[in-house]
Amino acid sequence: MNGLKMLLFSTTLLTAFTLHAQVTLKQQVKITDEGLHFDGRNLDFSNVGTPDTGEKYDFFFGPNISAHGDAVKTYKHYVFMTWYKGGKSERNVMLSRYNTLSGELSTIEFPHRHTGFRGDPLVGESHNTIGLSVSPINGTIHMVFDMHAYDNNNHDGKFKDDFFRYSYSIAGAAELPHSEFTLDKFVKDTSEVSQGENDYKHLTMTGDLSDKGNFARLTYPKFFTTVDGTLLLYMRLGGNNNGAYVFNRYDAETETWSTFTKFNENNQKLKGNPYNWGLYGNMKYVNGKLRVGFQQRSNDNSDKYKYQNGVYYAYSDHPDGFGDWKNHKGEPMTWPLINSDEIKVFEPGDYVSHTDANSVYIVGSFDWTVTEKGDIHIISKVRSTDRSRPDYEEVYIHSYKPAGAEDFIISTDFTGASEIYTSGDNVYIVGLEGGRPYVEKAQGGTNNFVRVYEASDGPTFDHGTLYIKDGKVYYYLMERTSGNAMPLYLQIIDLDLDLESDANAPIVSFPSPSLTVEQGFEKLSLNIAAESPVEVRTIQSVTLYINDELVRTDTSLPYLFGHGSKPHETGAMGWLDTHEPNPSPLPAGRHIFKAVAVDSEGDSSVATMMLTVNSNAPIISFPQESLEVDEGFEKLSLNISAESAVEGRTIESVSLYIDGEFVRTDTSLPYLFGHASKPHETGAMGWLDTHSPNPSPLTSGTYEFTAVAIDSEGEESTATMQLVVKGEPEPPVVTWPNSTVTVYEGYEKLAITIDAESPVEGRDIQSVTLYRNGELVRVDTRPVWNFGHSHAPYEFGAMGWLDRHDPNPAPLSVGTHTFTAVARDSAGLETESDMTLIVLSLPGPSVMINESDISLLTEYQNLSITADASTANDDTSLVSLALYIDDQLVREIYEPPFEWGADGYSNELLELSEGSHLARVVATDSNNKQSESSIFINIDLLGDLNKDSVVDKGDTRLFTAKLRAGETMDIRYDFNGDGVVNNRDTRGLIRRCTYSRCTSN
């Protein structure tokens, strides 16, 4: 019944809200048929080393990389979109610009190609999105792209001097004519770390390479534009359970970016927090402020959360976010943030009943926004980790705080969504259903979502990303087809905000946005204020709802609810002698009061108030909320406190449960469980000589103790306590970034940071000791546990890389070497982990013949062959390149250019006989290592047109036929030397006949 009433109410609101507005699709345009998409297998660490080498494009994390992330923005009447070009062998970064006035589409292809998961182009990575922005002040275009926490050293150094990718244009490029909107309007990198002549990627945004450390280990670029046109960029620093949000600022006047500033610290444990944590959410610039909303992922893998937990929110009153950060209540927070609890809003995990380790899954379907009026809206989802468990739970949550309210309203009456957006004072859910776009809308500060747009035809889409500006949705979508190149579309959906209608809507408010009363409250009279801002309009009605149930409609002033004639309508008991007790008073808990005012023109507005009814139920508590004991504990006595909050009531009983299993009911004070007469009921072994050992003690694990108190009126309350039974001592965990590392002999640098931590709260790592092939290298007693750094360059056998480093007198030789790291914690426990270092001998030189296979006719006059070669490293030099034809040495050259058959040696390749010849160029380096490259030289008999190894009348007939057919002939068939090949040259061909009879004929 409640669901039906909610549906009817929402339909009424839809009619009111759309009286002056109609959400419509204004434009749809295809951007390309070649958007990159990953259509292969979803790999993991067990099979990422063996990706598909054919057409299928395997991936890590997810299949989407085009129309994904911060990929669409507007500037004046242009829409800009970034994408990667498909298919698998292309992968170029692309930028498209759509002119909404002329319909003209311009596209720029950049040289850079998606590098793939950890540098493997055969494995796509969905996190490597392209962030995009255009400065409204100077028309520069900015792109940050294709990175996932890279730095100079990780992933075997594949991203050295290329771990951050930033491209930008000259001023004014955003609105250049179609013919001038070209790649050369972007600025090349000409620094000392440039990747080549066509490198448009910059390692820093400041232009100063000394800042490069500030741009390392970053992921997920997203740009914002402030109210004054300033560009901000935010990214995530670090990893999933130890990260930070960082942001920087663009000065359009000087055309320079600042370095990144942290919103929160990473490595929080080193700064006094009990644990490290990372962020899963967003930083956004919305309603004139920089704000942050996220879920936390800690490195505690033993709690009930599989990954994330909590909802956290903060905002800055500084125009660019550089300070003045506060929680949702307006209270100052530590900046940069260290303890996330300072800004915690609520815990979604409380909305499911599971308590066992890793049983609660809070990933995905999280987003937030803030309306122009200041209403905060946060959506999230919590479910059981194991979808197959019989008590599976799944809850979608919409938590919102109307402007002016003190606390959030937490509603589970929500169908769920992946993203939430705002425009004006409304909030919107925009998504795909059945592959087609839809839009749902609610007034800010409410949970009244109604569908206002739904596409019924057109392409079916796989996914998309969007940007909302000036009341329009710019929905950037990928069509659902097949393969690793799929079409991309732009849809422009007009929300038709009807700002004039919004400005004319009634002004309605409760006396207070929130109120608290005691259960059984006698009186609650609410005088709701409602008036029209338009002089000639009047208020026709004010309707009150409680928890979306219709209470009453009032059509005349004052709009008073809960007055003496209707004492029960606000949930009160009644306060006059003439009032019968309310048979259905509001129970303890939170209740949403909603007032809907309608004016004489049919415009409507909504106001909400949250009423908190404090419970009359018993007050019950354990001595502690949580407790830790060692496995085999002898005694656990729990004196549970229980009393009534209402004078005259008594406690009738207290019952104890462990993980839902009934233990015992106690009906008299003290409510003591686990006492000497019942030592085993709390899971203990027993502690007196008279106690037999418990046959079923609590073993290692986490248990939930629940106490239920019932008072003399039958009302009940519960309290919980978590008991952690610790098993055998847990040693520290030590891990290498890579279990196997491969280098070439003579390698200059190998620096590795080893991760070591204790899984036991309160313990610290005291030391990490490194051994090489069983021999002690060094004991490190201070984090970070870094070996092979610039002050100890030889620890992993490297030669040394700085000018001050003497060459290592004992570098590691070619072969396999074992390095062992031993971590010791403050309890004296140790763990070791091995890494295998494979040292390969240097490869020979690289050599390539520049020509492809060559085909010539006998009596040819010219033939030359060229080659290029390089050595494996700068310390090795090239000795020579030698050309062999059919294994016969032609000539050995000792310095470039490497060319045979030219200059003073023009005859050395002439007079090769008819047939096929193998040409090989052999390169030799200073290590006496060789490599070779080869081609075939095919010499055909001049005049042998039919390829039968003789020149005869068959060839003369074929020659004549080709001339009649107008085919182009080799100029060497111009036997009479008149500059053309025609019938007059037939006699010259006949004279070349192999047999005399052909000549006479």
From Swiss-Prot:
Ulvan lyase involved in ulvan degradation. Ulvan is the main polysaccharide component of the Ulvales (green seaweed) cell wall. It is composed of disaccharide building blocks comprising 3-sulfated rhamnose (Rha3S) linked to D-glucuronic acid (GlcA), L-iduronic acid (IduA), or D-xylose (Xyl). Ulvan lyase catalyzes preferentially the endolytic cleavage of the glycosidic bond between Rha3S and the uronic acid GlcA, but not IduA, producing oligosaccharides that have unsaturated 4-deoxy-L-threo-hex-4-enopyranosiduronic acid (deltaUA) at the non-reducing end. Keywords: Calcium, Lyase, Metal-binding, Signal. Disulfide bonds: none annotated. Its EC number is 4.2.2.-. It comes from the Bacteria. Ca(2+) 2 binds at D300, D303, Y305. Residues 1-21 form the signal peptide. Substrate binds at S126, H127, Y280, R297, Y361. This is Ulvan lyase, long isoform. GO terms for molecular function: hydrolase activity, hydrolyzing O-glycosyl compounds; lyase activity; metal ion binding. The keyword Magnesium does not apply. The keyword Metal-binding applies. The active site is at H127 (proton donor/acceptor). SUPFAM superfamilies: Type I dockerin domain (SSF63446). One of its GO terms (biological process) is polysaccharide catabolic process. It comes from Pseudoalteromonas sp. (strain PLSV). The record marks R236 as: Neutralizes the sugar carboxylate group at subsite +1. Ca(2+) 1 binds at D189, D199, K201. Belongs to the polysaccharide lyase 24 family.
